[in-house]
């Protein structure tokens, strides 16, 4: 607990690997370092309301062991072609839950991102130009609101809306010989788009909860292309039937059609 009333709790951890020390002793030509962390914060705002914040991520670094004394041919080969790299990733999310007699309301916001960088210098000398320079970033942001009703005329209903955005960026630079001349190849790629969704499921049990029916419908749209703007063109229906004909046996059947983003 991090509050006096005990309604707010925090759980967190961090780890770091020291493989670079072991690899250095073994005389390996690369020295990795790995780090990861995670946390969860939960706060009860009242008898019916709760807020939570969660996250996990990592950041890693792999550098070359250029301090090797008298490296053999295998070590020289690896040092000659292997680039150094840094990469990191994380997922953060926050949510609010309001519970009431007939069900609950949940709102969730999240973001995840990944970054990767590769680079190498001539003869592993950082004062010389880079022979490889690669950078990529991608991220995804989402928001979702969902309501669950446990009894609507004997039915159970879940429905909601959501949306978000995605981004991808890649930049690459490297020297290349073309027609006997040295030039720098450049590659740049960027992509950004939005997304939105609607979804609902309706279910009910019959015959003393031995037979159940679930009907679901989902609609997805995105700004990636004009053909995908209208969510009514990307409808994903689903039907599931389940029958418990013996205490240890249940027969289930489902049919669905899904559109993948």
Tell me what each language-model feature is.
Residues 1, 35-39, 55-57, 88-94, ...:
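Hydrophobic, lipid-facing positions within transmembrane beta-strands of outer-membrane proteins
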Residues 1-4, 42-46, 95-101, 148-156, ...:
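Structural signature of outer-membrane beta-barrel channels/translocons
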Residues 1-29, 36-44, 52-56:
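Predominantly transmembrane beta-strands of Gram-negative outer membrane beta-barrel pores used
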Residues 8-10, 48-51, 102-105, 115, ...:
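Repeated loop/turn-to-beta-strand initiation elements of outer-membrane beta-barrel proteins
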Residues 16-20, 57-61, 100-102, 111-115, ...:
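Transmembrane beta-strands of outer-membrane beta-barrel pores
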Residues 19, 24-31, 50-99, 113-138:
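Flexible loop and strand-edge segments within Gram-negative outer membrane beta-barrel domains
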Residues 56, 152-156, 162, 186-261:
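Structural signature of Gram-negative outer-membrane beta-barrels, strongest in the C-terminal barrel
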Residues 67-72, 115-117, 172-175, 243, ...:
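Surface-exposed extracellular loop regions of Gram-negative outer-membrane beta-barrel proteins
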